[in-house]
Amino acid sequence: MTLRSRNRGPDPTIAIIGVGFAGIGAAVKLRRAGYRRITLFDRATGPGGTWWHNTYVGAEVDTPSVLYSFSWMPWNWSRTHVRQAELQQYLSAVVDAYDLRKDCRFGVDIQSVIWDEDACEYSIISGGEEIMRARYVVSGVGLLSDPNIPNLPGLSSFEGTMFHSAQWNHDVDLTGKRVAIVGSGSTATQLVPALKGVAKQVTMFSREPNWIVPKRARDYTPRERLALESPVAQRIVRLKTLFQRDRAQFGAALWRPGSRQNRAAEAGARQYLESSLEGHPDLIEAVTPRHPYGGKRPVISDTYFQALLSDNVKLVSRAVAEVTENGVIDAAGDHHEVDVLIMSTGFKAEFLSTLEVIGSEGKSLHDYWDGDDRAFLGLMVPEFPNFFIMYGPNTNGGTIVSNLELQASFVSSTIRHAERCRAKFVEVRGWAADIYDVVVQRMLAGTAFQYEHNYYRSDSGRIATQWPDGVISYGVLTKVLRSPFLRYATGTRRSPVVTATQPAPREGDH
């Protein structure tokens, strides 16, 4: 029996915004649940999301490849930590394996989704016009999707080449050029080693250093690749790695300054720093962070410290104050002549920064949040019915792809239950969202995430991005916090509520 015949009604239309890990994961879960009227939108011209756009030299993941992939589609990875091209190839293969390409509309920038109270569906807007109506909308836009380019004085006067690392200009030949990298995060620390053998001079401007730990990345041996061709073997490796990471983050202990786990992590990072730069006390001082371990996202790299010892690499431990026609002036007033200026300044850390969402009674989601992003399980917001946020508030942490799989299961089960109830919409109850947020914030209290200079905090100082524990605890909550925390209604928001007297169906129950 198909889901459609069981519902005894039309297959609901579902719009998914974004064709990266989040959007693809949600689409596959919904497709496997029996839904066919799924449309995926992406402003890019192909699948991959972040890994379609971020094609900078040296781009690779920080997470082990066996975890940075879907559990239901293992892959014969070439490395322990895969590079951008192979990861983008993987996501493209997933799209084709599940026949999603025909449902993808690439090169379409969705500006807004607007809830129609009477029809109980969303109007999908692109280019100022409605291009589709959908009963449900799943956002796979993510948190870090809109590049942040600082408005530096004199930037427009620069006569060289300038671009953001997430918008890499492959037409520019960096051979023999004087290259400046602004930033000191994960991308910047990948760029320095990658460019030092090409550019004449690489100058990195680091306003504040990060704790750095070794990645231990390497190519898999032929024997390892042969073993990992077995889905069972890869699942065992995946689960072992997942449990090890989960145990380290249990109860947020790793992120609590003064805890045994946090002290050990910081001591390990400090030892790695000092041993890598032994004999260079000035450099050691320049790259030693002043914040507790976890106060900013730790950087994972095997090659950065060694690159700093190269003759053509210069670290400037000051921010860029001004840009001139032929270079930059740092905060101390020193001028540095450069030919190419690469902004490795991250992204606008704002949920749904590229998407406007209008919910019940014409409310804007960004106005509703008012700079204080929050969501039930990171997925649903009161008064925004039939709308789901993948990788939403307080879901960053643990293992991202595993979290996304859990979220996709929640979305699929919630939609299935709504259709079985013949509900026109489902939304989280306000009291449930409030209680959930209070509990999460209490769990986050006292962690290094409260450090002032990071992207974890909202305008009010509340920690808006991080999940305080591991994947397992989050997974349990996505299975348990269903009914009665959700409200199913048969018509408009004023219609009688369908009482969910049974839990939402388990995955595979169709």
Language-model features, listed with the residues they occupy:
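Short beta-strand to alpha-helix junction loop
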Residues: 75-93, 257-263, 292-303
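Rossmann-like dinucleotide-binding core of oxidoreductases
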Residues: 4-11, 21, 25-46, 139-271, ...
